[in-house]
Amino acid sequence: MTRDYPRTEWDRAVDAVREAHLLLANGGFDGAASRAYYAAFHALTALFALEGRVFTKHSALEAAVHRDLVKAGKWSGDLGRDFSFCVDLRGVGDYGTEVRVDATQAADAIASARRILVAVRDLLPVNFPPVPDG
């Protein structure tokens, strides 16, 4: 992991939120949910990378969010639920066979991801630039 890795992940998170908005606006609800998840994923990857922690499984990152952020009192339970919601909806968007993500769910996933980005930045504002509006 290079010194620039956390910032690169942060930039990917910001890009993914922007992409999720574009997909939502154009009716790509499954893709919007997936990009929202990856926005949260990259933001959290950036946060944990600053501690020298890298996860090779999505489930390990989700466990770390609940154990090291929520249960440790750094984040509210709502933020943990936001991440789990994004995880679950990504599964529908990427792998669902008989179910699709609808517009409301996609918008909710984007809002959840954005709250996660803001919370990550609030923990370490010197490391990450502000989350753009939109």
Residue positions per predicted region:
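Terminal alpha-helical segments
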Residues: 1-134
